[in-house]
């Protein structure tokens, strides 16, 4: 039986970089966010809401203050899944994070969606 020789990971990576330049590109944060946004939109087009949520969570993981991603989560809960308590929670997060910026478009949309839910539930 053939014995495997131990290969150090750093040596292996060095060999790959040397023979295949550009084989590994470390994406920047804004590139990852753009990629996750694209994947989110694709998932929404296919009505795969759980997959869309995964990509929104990845965006929020990279940018915890991303109001658009939090608002999009609220809209999925509200309009697609009809999970109103979860939608209200997301909309409240957007409103709290945008406190002091009364004209912020995300905050205005969150307030309008909250009013719509409250009217529907009353």
Regions found by a protein language model. Give the residues of each.
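TPR-adjacent "capping" and linker segments in tetratricopeptide-repeat scaffold/adaptor proteins
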Residues: 19-35
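Conserved structural position within tetratricopeptide repeats
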Residues: 58-61, 96
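Specific register positions within alpha-helical solenoid repeats of the TPR/Sel1-like families, i.e.
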Residues: 44, 78-79, 119
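Residue-level recognition of tetratricopeptide repeat
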Residues: 41, 75-76, 116
């Amino acid at each position: 039986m053939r014995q495997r020789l131990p290969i150090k990971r750093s040596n292996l990576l060095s060999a790959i970089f040397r023979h295949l330049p550009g084989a590994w590109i470390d994406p920047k944060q804004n590139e990852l966010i753009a990629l996750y946004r694209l994947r989110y939109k694709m998932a929404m087009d296919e009505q795969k809401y759980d997959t869309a949520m995964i990509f929104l969570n990845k965006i929020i993981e990279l940018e915890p203050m991303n109001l658009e991603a939090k608002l999009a989560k609220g809209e999925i809960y509200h309009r697609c899944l009809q999970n109103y308590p979860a939608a209200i929670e997301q909309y409240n997060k957007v409103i709290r994070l945008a406190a002091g910026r009364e004209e912020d478009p995300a905050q205005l949309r969150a307030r309008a969606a909250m009013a719509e839910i409250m009217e529907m539930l009353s």
